Amino acid sequence: MTEQNTQSGFVFNLEKIYIKDSSFEVPGAPQVFLDTTNPEVGVQLGISHNQVNAEQGLYEVVLAVTVTAKHADKAVFLAEAHQAGLFRIGGMPEADLPKVLEIACPNVLLPFVREAVNELVGKGG
């Protein structure tokens, strides 16, 4: 995941990708597995970012996903994953930085957090 434009000096590198936090809860297990009706599922996304090292142009971006499933106001499961990436970004106008941190970086992280949530839900029952 490296994109460099040597003529303009633009740098966009994914240096490291990692799970910062994950959790899975099935508060009503094992009784909840006996219910065959489909639960109501909700998905929430959140993005956060912070500068790790200004001289090196390093930024941590975290894409947080929370999936809740409920049936008759009772929680079936709660899955949460915070997928993080360490990005090296530089050589661009300061005004463009928020777009990169809030659009381009989460776009890179999305397939990884989707896989993490899929594994949590799949292994959780």
Task: List the predicted regions and their residue ranges.
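N-terminal intrinsically disordered, cationic/polar leader segments
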Residues: 1-125
